[in-house]
Amino acid sequence: MRVLVTGAAGFIGSHIAETMREAGHEVRGLDSLTPAVHGVPGVAAVHGGHGLPGGRPEHAGTDLVVGDVRDPAAVDEALAGVDAVCHQAAMVGLGVDLSDLPMYSDVNVTGTAVLLEAMGRHGIGRLVFASSMVVYGEGAYDCAAHGRVRPLPRDPADLAGGLFEPRCPVCGSPLGTSTVGEEAPLDPRNAYAASKVAQEHLAASWARLTGGAAVGLRYHNVYGPRMPRDTPYSGVAAIFRSRLENGAPPRVFEDGGQRRDFVHVRDVARANLLALSAVSEGVAGDGSLHCYNVASGEPHTVGEMASALAGAFGGIEPVVTGEYRLGDVRHIVASPEGAARDLGFRAQTPFASGMAEFARAPLREPALARA
């Protein structure tokens, strides 16, 4: 099968392209190779273990179209002769402030709309795309007295006093956590999350209008080789790893007890391969969108992740600062059962060995602008 991978030169997209090729698919890539993400001429960017001038990837066997997913001409060129699309191109991260809203909307929402419209014209009816755990907002919480509840926003006075656990909206008691399934209501709490929900709605509309097969993969905390270095838009794993490389301890906010699901990028790539099989074999071909969590199923705290990285790197022990950011999610832990049932996906990389590898794996060089 000939598969277009948008964002094929990026952190996750490059691993997907490799996995698709290894499975026997013919891969075409579409990537803008923007300097903010991939560096500029004369600056070596680590990619696949190679220092590459200007950050241009050398993917043997990948026909790379250099262009922006918002550009209809570039998208038309990339879609020619393609059987399926794996859409990864996006502006990532949770954003910094309201000034990010236009760019997230432009890149993620408009770009997806341009791609889907072109897929309709080209008669391409198979789509796998990257969504995110951020569409859920806070995770799932249970009160001992009132069952499953949606927690109140955390009170700044509680946070300042070191009380980090969300409270029941009925009785005010601290809540216990549970796993989030795909049926959970969506509650986007920042610009990136809102753009991901919009992508899901666009894909659902495309599937209904065309009868196409669409699978959205809600990635949880992805980590692994080629992750970008520390920027305001990086994931916490990259931020911690960058500090260790600079001889500084990871700074863990709150009390380090925030629970997350850390999933290795190679597992994420394999989930995309299995989703491609699902849309090709009619498992998800009923003219509707099917979304799945992509997660390890083994939650860990942010403090545990920082300690695992520091121990494997041989650096300074993490520092738990007690600092906090208003709007941060306290806990979000995924149920992986939907993807296991329908796609046959189970993560294979254990937390300890994955973090040990990541502690020494090459990172991308710092971007010169937001990415």
Predicted regions and their residues:
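N-terminal Rossmann-like NAD(P)+-binding domain of SDR-like oxidoreductases, especially those catalyzing
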Residues: 1-219
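A structural alpha-helix within SAM-dependent methyltransferase catalytic domains
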Residues: 21, 79, 116-120, 204, ...
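A glycine/serine/threonine-rich, flexible loop-to-helix segment
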Residues: 41, 142, 229-238
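Hydrophobic alpha-helical packing elements
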Residues: 74, 78, 195, 236, ...
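A conserved pocket-lining segment of Rossmann-fold NAD(P)-dependent short-chain dehydrogenase/reductase
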Residues: 97, 168-190, 214, 218-229, ...
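Hydrophobic alpha-helix immediately C-terminal to the catalytic Tyr-X-X-X-Lys motif of short-chain
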Residues: 198, 202, 206, 236, ...
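C-terminal substrate-binding subdomain of Rossmann-fold SDR/epimerase-dehydratase oxidoreductases
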Residues: 245-371
